[in-house]
């Protein structure tokens, strides 16, 4: 199985690695995992008063495809509304990174992490 150049780039030079303070009201955190392979993904968003994701970061324990998926989506969601970010599908991620079929679960984790972070943000700001 060969990784695409985009996967290798995001794995070797991951963007937006880090974390925000979870107590901040404008921060939403999503923690998801895939027990089958041991991948764990934490994705956080920082949302401005207009409902736009102004920043995003991640910490992922997992394979190169999981790290690349996390890195890619943090780039994609910056500047998007919550609704736009929620509409990102794992198929978009898998296609952009040219993930092999055996690694599709990594793109599913990234989609789930986005949704979990948005849900957390919404729950904190009801």
Swiss-Prot record:
UniProt record, GO biological process: iron-sulfur cluster assembly
Signal peptide residues are none
Kindly give the CDD domains that the UniProt entry links to this protein.
Answer: IscU_like (cd06664)
Give any GO molecular function from the UniProt entry: iron ion binding
- InterPro entries from the entry? ISCU, NIF_FeS_clus_asmbl_NifU_N
Q: Which GO terms describe its cellular component?
A: cytoplasm
Similarity comment: Belongs to the NifU family.
What does this protein's UniProt record list under function? A scaffold on which IscS assembles Fe-S clusters. Subsequently gives the nascent cluster to other proteins. It is likely that Fe-S cluster coordination is flexible as the role of this complex is to build and then hand off Fe-S clusters.
Subunit composition?
Forms a heterotetramer with IscS; each subunit of the IscS dimer contacts an IscU monomer.
**What protein name applies here?**
Iron-sulfur cluster assembly scaffold protein IscU
The species is Buchnera aphidicola subsp. Baizongia pistaciae (strain Bp)
